[in-house]
């Protein structure tokens, strides 16, 4: 958690500096790096692929948590349908998914101002409730001593390679926001505000989350009387459920769902809407773009990902292989090719002009992105090649390095 928070905050600061300095959103920032037409490639990757999948993943996770709430309020809820499934999803969870999806969409359609206000009160409220839950979990685990001495039993030995792989996947979860953090930092009053705010905010929140997680896991271990499956997708919900008190369990799960909903609305549906609007203004508005993310995010059957950890790991490797190179190319372009100086007239080029790149596409950036993606994902096709398998396991880090170095080698020729 600590390593992830440090890495993510550094990514936010470095990649958000251009937007903070010039007040431009991600859609415009990416035009400088990839060209006014070439920008559609990374923009679609960020706004659509990640937005679609994360909407589905977050909503199904929230739905599984909501199952516990409904079963506490309406005993027997989880037996609805008698084991019948709908597209591979149990009927009770399908109902919970529909409810969470509708709530998320309604919040999104309320508008960006409401989203901002919702996020501002949701985050503190969630943490207050989680801290209360932490104290109850510690008590349930038999005291602070038991929590501090708690050590999950790994299914395989912990190695350096395994540790880096874990950190890479954790960072991949936040790789999308690293890429389009400019949509947030563009509103900063100065370039120094993100430098101070992100590290403090990330470190405090992640360390608190780590403490809460360990406390809940220790509580679950104490209640279950031994080892627990830390790889189980619903492990955190099970840990909350182990507290026992129905009112507290319901309150904590609802708080967790509020936080998850705020994340998917602000961190995934909104970027999807913004990117679709920026690239296809005649076809989409910010609201309709977000709705597309919700619909497609459901049609991909996201519950198949959370039910199969292999699929989930594949997804994190995939997004790491995409976002790592994009972030690396953007950093190399801004700090070395541009020397932190952007030409806004070129970025906001009139329709029909090339914006400083032949045909409006920076093929060097696009080429580096493609090569980086192929290299980092090759390990999935050739798992027997140890080097490629390791590169794939460290997809975000390796993709970032390959994209950064690759663009330094072929792309950093300063334009007049």
Question: How should each PLM-predicted stretch be described?
Answer:
Residues 96-103, 136-141, 151-216, 245-266, ...:
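Hydrophobic, membrane-embedded alpha-helices of multi-pass small-molecule transporters
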Residues 63-72, 125-152, 173-174, 214-223, ...:
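Hydrophobic alpha-helical segments and their helix-loop junctions in multi-pass secondary transporters
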Residues 44, 71-109, 124-133, 162-181, ...:
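Transmembrane alpha-helical segments of multi-pass small-molecule transport proteins
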Residues 63, 95-139, 198-202, 315-324:
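Membrane-interface loop-to-helix entry segments
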Residues 6-11, 46-58, 124-140, 169-176, ...:
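Selective recognition of specific alpha-helical transmembrane segments in multi-pass small-molecule
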Residues 327-409, 413:
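C-terminal membrane-solvent junction of multi-pass transporters and transport-like membrane proteins
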Residues 15-17, 33, 41, 99-122, ...:
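Membrane-water interface regions at transmembrane-helix termini and the short interhelical loops
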């Amino acid at each position: 958690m600590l390593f992830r928070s440090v890495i993510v905050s550094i990514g936010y600061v470095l990649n958000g500096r251009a937007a903070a300095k010039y007040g431009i959103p991600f859609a415009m920032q990416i035009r400088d790096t990839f060209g006014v037409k070439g920008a559609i490639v990374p923009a679609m990757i960020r706004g659509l692929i990640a937005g679609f999948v994360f909407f589905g993943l977050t909503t199904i996770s929230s739905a599984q948590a909501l199952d516990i709430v409904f079963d506490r309020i309406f005993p027997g809820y989880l037996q609805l349908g008698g084991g019948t499934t709908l597209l591979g999803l149990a009927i009770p969870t399908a109902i919970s998914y529909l409810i969470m999806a509708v709530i998320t969409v309604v919040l999104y359609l309320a508008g960006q101002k409401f989203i901002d206000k919702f996020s501002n009160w949701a985050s503190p409220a969630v943490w207050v409730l989680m801290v209360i839950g932490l104290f109850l979990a510690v008590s349930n685990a038999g005291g602070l001593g038991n929590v501090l001495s708690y050590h999950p039993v790994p299914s395989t030995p912990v190695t350096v390679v395994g540790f880096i792989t874990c950190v890479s996947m954790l960072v991949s979860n936040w790789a999308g926001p690293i890429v389009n953090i400019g949509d947030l930092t563009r509103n900063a009053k100065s370039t120094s505000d993100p430098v101070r705010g992100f590290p403090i905010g990330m470190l405090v929140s992640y360390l608190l989350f780590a403490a809460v997680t360990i406390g809940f896991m220790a509580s679950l271990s104490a209640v279950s009387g031994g080892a627990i499956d830390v790889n189980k997708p619903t492990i955190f919900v099970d840990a909350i459920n182990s507290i026992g008190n129905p009112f507290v369990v319901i309150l904590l799960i609802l708080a967790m769902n509020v936080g998850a909903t705020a994340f998917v609305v602000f961190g995934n549906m909104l970027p999807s809407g913004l990117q679709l609007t920026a690239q296809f203004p005649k076809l989409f508005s910010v609201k309709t773009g977000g709705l597309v993310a919700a619909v497609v995010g459901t049609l991909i059957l996201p519950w198949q990902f959370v039910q199969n950890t292999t699929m989930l790991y594949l997804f994190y490797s995939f997004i790491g292989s995409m976002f790592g190179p994009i972030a690396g190319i953007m950093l190399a372009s801004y700090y070395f090719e541009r020397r932190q100086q952007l030409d806004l007239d070129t970025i906001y080029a009139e329709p029909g002009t090339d914006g400083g790149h032949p045909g409006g596409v920076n093929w060097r950036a696009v080429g580096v992105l493609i090569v980086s993606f192929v290299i980092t994902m090759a390990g999935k096709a050739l798992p027997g090649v140890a080097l490629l398998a390791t590169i794939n396991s460290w997809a975000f880090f390796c993709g970032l390095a390959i994209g950064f170095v690759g663009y330094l080698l072929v792309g950093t020729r300063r334009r007049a």
